[in-house]
């Protein structure tokens, strides 16, 4: 089989997801214009428009809050946080609001937000942190997924789009 960059696998999978799910959208720092920092969304803003594939400011807590609001209203948002190191800025909102919505409302409300990020590069001093142990404890009520490769990541997105529960 031909070798393909991981970004191409993700881009093609997101393309199929946006085609299949009209309520799916993705937003975050650099998602739209450049197609995310690794070009995993390359060309999708042009194809699906600025509402479904959009850029945001550098405010992780706001990105998470926007995602919760969109999910509560029946959309299927994917909120991108550029690097796992930055997830800590949104942890309070994820822990108190997102992760507990189904439980607190006895299943009457759902916020199936997917929080997309990348990490575990384990090189250099920037973007290489791994708060995973803390996330597992702090985000009870959310799926926390760490794919081994981009094919598995694509499969996770496909499965999560059918779920009513939030995930990181």
Task: Please state what every model-predicted region is.
Residues 1-168:
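Thiamine diphosphate
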């Amino acid at each position: 089989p031909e070798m393909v960059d991981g970004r191409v696998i993700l881009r093609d999978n997101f393309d199929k997801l946006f085609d299949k799910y009209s309520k799916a959208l993705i937003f975050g720092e650099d998602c739209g214009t450049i197609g995310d920092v690794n070009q995993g969304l390359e060309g999708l803003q042009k194809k699906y428009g600025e509402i479904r594939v959009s850029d945001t400011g550098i405010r992780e807590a706001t990105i998470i809050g926007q995602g919760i609001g969109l999910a509560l209203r029946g959309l299927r948002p994917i909120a991108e946080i550029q690097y796992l190191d930055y997830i800590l800025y949104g942890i309070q909102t994820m822990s108190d609001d997102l992760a507990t919505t189904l439980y607190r409302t006895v299943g009457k409300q759902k916020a199936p937000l997917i929080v997309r990020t990348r990490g575990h590069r384990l090189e250099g001093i920037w973007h290489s942190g791994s708060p995973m142990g803390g996330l597992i404890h702090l985000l009870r009520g959310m799926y926390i997924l760490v794919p081994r490769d981009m094919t598995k990541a694509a499969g996770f997105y496909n499965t999560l789009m059918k779920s009513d529960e939030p995930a990181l």
